[in-house]
Structure formats: structure tokens, C-alpha cells
């Protein structure tokens, strides 16, 4: 990957395997909550040891090169940022397939990554919402606008739909709440939560705020 070569040259990195394996780990965990400790442990279990300080530098280099975007977690009820665990999203998901192959196709995380990057493109700051023991995929903020978003591949089953909508229904403020999924239908409203087809949302065909 040319980006890794540029990072190696810019920061004069000698141990290129550490950088490459750090990149692979993050690409393989797009949309998962990770920490420096969990990444270090995962790499160590795979036979590669490095300090958390070195790892932090590599992660910062990857983000500074705009290959990855770090998204922090936000406690919705407590209205504060959480210090442990972040998510990382890839500027272009094709980089993941080019680096790791296409055997592991997780469309839920693919769609989540697409929505994250599109929100950033539209000028939103995004956070992962934590509400009690539930998770909101995105809290998106732009000036005085705020919206809570869940992203899913398929919500046709009652169990999956309930899993996605229940955290949104627990939020007590009046900001918009939306589920973006592969529905292939017109937008619907469920107890104040908009359910929007991801293709229509990406094309900007829906009024979702």
C-alpha cells in the first residue's frame, strides 16, 4: 500500500512489520470498539510485541495520513466523553479488500463505515453514543443540528429491528433519531424514529434531519 510506504519514509520507521501489522489489525476491526491495550494484546497474541507508546504513534500516523478516522465514544446520559475505547473508520473501504482480501464480507460494518465517511463529508462531527449498556452507532453534530443514527445491513427480522431501535427509544431528548439500513423501501416512521434505505440516504434523496 503506497500510503504505508509514504508513512514509513516521512516518519523514518525502521520496523516496517509493526506498522503494517498495526494497519492490518485496524482494517480487520473497522467499526469495532478497540483501545491501545486491546490492540497491543491482539498483536502480542499473534506473535508481535510492541509498547503502547509505539502503537499510539503508528495509529496517529495512520490517522494523520487520512487513511483512518478515529471516532470517540460519548456518554449520552452523562454528557461526557469516555476515555476508554474508540472506533476507527476507513476513508475508502476498498483499501481493506486490497490489503486483506474479500473473504470476510461483513455488510453491517461496510454500511456503518460508508455512513461514517458520508457524515464526515457532509460536515458532521461524529461520536459513538453510549447509553447505559446500549450503543448508538453515531451521534452526529453539525452546528446546532444533532441526530442519533443506527446503521444495519438487514432489519427485516423482528429481533434485529428491536435491537436497533430500542437504544434510540431510550434517548429522552427531542433530536432526530434515524435507522439507516438496506430496506429497499420508502422512508417510514416508527414511534418517531425514521427508517431510511441506505441507498436513498447516500444519494441525498431523503429529508432525515
Label each PLM-derived region with a short phrase.
Residues 89, 149, 178-180, 194-196:
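Hydrophobic/aromatic beta-strand patches that form the interior of the parallel beta-sheet core
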Residues 136, 157-160, 185-190:
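Short active-site-adjacent structural elements
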Amino acid at each position: 500500500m503506497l500510503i504505508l510506504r509514504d508513512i514509513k519514509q516521512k516518519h523514518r520507521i525502521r520496523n516496517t512489520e509493526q506498522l503494517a501489522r498495526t494497519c492490518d489489525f485496524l482494517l480487520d476491526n473497522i467499526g469495532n470498539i478497540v483501545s491501545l491495550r486491546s490492540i497491543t494484546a491482539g498483536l502480542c497474541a499473534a506473535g508481535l510485541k510492541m509498547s503502547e507508546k509505539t502503537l499510539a504513534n503508528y495509529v496517529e500516523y495512520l490517522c494523520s495520513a487520512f487513511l483512518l478516522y478515529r471516532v470517540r465514544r460519548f456518554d449520552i446520559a452523562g454528557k461526557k466523553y469516555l476515555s476508554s475505547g474508540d472506533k476507527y473508520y476507513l476513508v475508502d473501504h476498498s483499501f481493506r479488500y486490497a490489503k486483506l482480501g474479500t473473504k470476510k464480507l461483513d455488510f453491517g460494518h461496510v454500511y456503518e463505515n460508508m455512513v461514517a465517511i458520508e457524515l464526515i463529508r457532509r460536515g458532521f462531527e461524529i461520536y459513538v453514543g453510549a447509553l447505559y449498556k446500549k450503543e448508538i452507532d453515531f451521534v452526529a453534530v453539525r452546528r446546532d443540528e444533532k441526530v442519533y443514527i443506527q446503521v444495519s445491513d438487514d432489519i427485516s427480522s423482528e429481533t434485529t429491528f428491536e435491537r436497533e431501535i430500542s437504544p434510540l427509544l431510550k434517548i429522552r431528548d427531542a433530536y432526530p433519531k434515524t435507522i439507516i439500513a438496506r430496506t429497499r423501501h420508502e422512508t417510514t416512521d416508527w414511534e418517531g424514529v425514521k427508517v431510511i434505505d441506505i441507498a436513498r440516504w447516500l444519494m441525498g434523496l431523503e429529508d432525515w434531519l
